From Swiss-Prot:
UniProt domain tr-type G: residue ranges: 10-207
Organism this protein belongs to: Clavibacter michiganensis subsp. michiganensis (strain NCPPB 382)
Catalytic activity reported: GTP + H2O = GDP + phosphate + H(+)
Main function: GTP hydrolase that promotes the GTP-dependent binding of aminoacyl-tRNA to the A-site of ribosomes during protein biosynthesis.
Subunit details: Monomer.
NCBIfam families hit by this protein: EF-Tu, PRK00049.1, PRK12735.1, PRK12736.1, small_GTP
Protein name, per record: Elongation factor Tu
Region of interest (G1), residue spans: 19-26
Binding site for Mg(2+): 26
Membrane-spanning segments: none
Lineage: Bacteria, Bacillati, Actinomycetota, Actinomycetes, Micrococcales
Region annotation G2: where it falls in the sequence: 63-67
Length: 397
């Protein structure tokens, strides 16, 4: 028997949980999965327990979620793919790849703590990587008896959202308890239902770039014995039918190949659509021929480049950025889509240095080519932390 076909009967929306590492993102994700499985049983709504979402063995020993977990569920209105984005500062790299996959996100803030430095960092990062919409789950609300404290925390979170140009005044803020909901406490089960109603109503149905030429950044590469090499990622735009020719662009010389199979959530598809997480089986391609950071594209639609002009905002010290200025010939990493590439910065004439908190134009020469177009966003990173974010304004070479 072949794999089940993936049914596209409802709008598909990519969401996720972001926020401080100890505020209960993974517990909340498990609670959403359980509550929906109980309330709307279906083939999609299968309960995922905490351990399976928090998977990957070496991470749980230290109590830190590193990898991104994908959980699938549906409400009566929509089908959701939910990424549990890691919260620890060391793993902001994954946050960048995770947050980039969201049409909207649930910001998890513990009512017992309120917004912390990491919460701020995540909201800032969500803005930089283009998460269009945030709403708030005030988790652990069962542990706060004083209604006034809950109101103060809500106010603080709204101010934080507004400070990063999210709609802090109107974003839904729902009091939840992931733990109590998992235990089946009726009051808190209802709050999870209320949270998902808010997600249905407030995260706009994404406008997919289906008519543009196909592009999917490679996040992971693996071998399926007897079938060949599979690359996974989220299709950014376009559609791709089985047996289409594609090019693998960036980092190495461009290669042409054919897609012989497409999967999503372990189900076979005839085509991949913009906005979906999928796996592509590539004909005659070896595991070592492809790497994270490359893109799979419609032939001829995108070209690799090393030199570009860009404009970037350099984070202030308070936002977790550098403590001192940088000068011409500064060599940070430029994070494009799913990978870091070292680049050398040349500053505009008359600009001696760039201070934390400044916005600047720059010329950049990367040490490896990246599939690039004007308008493409990037993060500037050093030693694993984000120190700036910008956009390609002009391709030079």
């Amino acid at each position: 028997m072949g794999k089940a076909k993936f049914e596209r009967t409802k709008p598909h929306v990519n969401i996720g949980t972001i926020g401080h590492v100890d505020h209960g993102k993974t517990t909340l994700t498990a609670a959403i999965s359980k509550v929906l499985a109980d309330k709307y049983p279906s083939a999609t709504n299968v309960q995922r327990d905490f351990a399976s979402i928090d998977s990957a063995p070496e991470e749980r020993q230290r109590g830190i979620t590193i990898n991104i977990s994908h959980v699938e569920y549906e409400t009566p209105k929509r089908h959701y793919a939910h990424v549990d984005a890691p919260g620890h500062a060391d793993y902001i790299k994954n946050m960048i790849t995770g947050a980039a996959q969201m049409d909207g996100a649930i910001l998890v803030v513990a009512a017992t703590d309120g917004p912390m430095a990491q919460t701020r960092e995540h909201v800032l990062l969500a803005k930089q990587v283009g998460v269009p919409y945030l709403l708030v789950a005030l988790n652990k609300s069962d542990m706060v008896d004083d209604e006034e404290i809950l109101e103060l925390v809500e106010l603080e979170v709204r101010e934080l959202l507004s400070s990063q140009d999210f709609d802090g005044d109107n974003a839904p803020v729902v009091q939840v308890s992931g733990l109590k909901a998992l235990e089946g406490d009726e009051k808190w089960v209802e709050q999870i239902v209320k949270l998902m109603d808010a997600v249905d109503e407030s995260i706009p149905e994404p406008v997919r770039d289906k008519d543009k030429p196909f592009l999917m950044p490679v996040e992971d590469v693996f071998t399926i014995t007897g079938r060949g090499t599979v690359v996974t990622g989220r299709a950014e735009r376009g559609t791709l039918a089985i047996n289409s020719d594609v090019e693998i662009v960036g980092i190495r010389p461009t290669v042409k190949t054919t897609v012989t199979g497409i999967e999503m959530f372990h189900k076979q598809l005839d085509e991949a659509w913009a906005g979906e997480n999928c796996g592509l089986l590539l004909r005659g391609t070896k595991r070592e021929d492809v790497e994270r950071g490359q893109v799979i594209v419609k032939p001829g639609s995108v070209t690799p480049h090393t030199d570009f002009e860009g404009t970037a905002y350099i984070l202030s010290k308070e936002e977790g950025g550098r403590h001192n200025p940088f000068y011409a010939n500064y060599r940070p990493q430029f994070y494009f889509r799913t990978t870091d590439v070292t680049g050398v910065i040349t500053l505009p004439e008359g600009t001696e240095m760039v201070m934390p908190g400044d916005t600047t134009d720059m010329n950049v020469a990367l040490i490896q080519p990246i599939a690039m177009e004007e308008g493409l966003g990037f993060a500037i990173r050093e030693g694993g932390r984000t120190v700036g974010a910008g956009t390609v304004t002009k391709i030079v070479k």
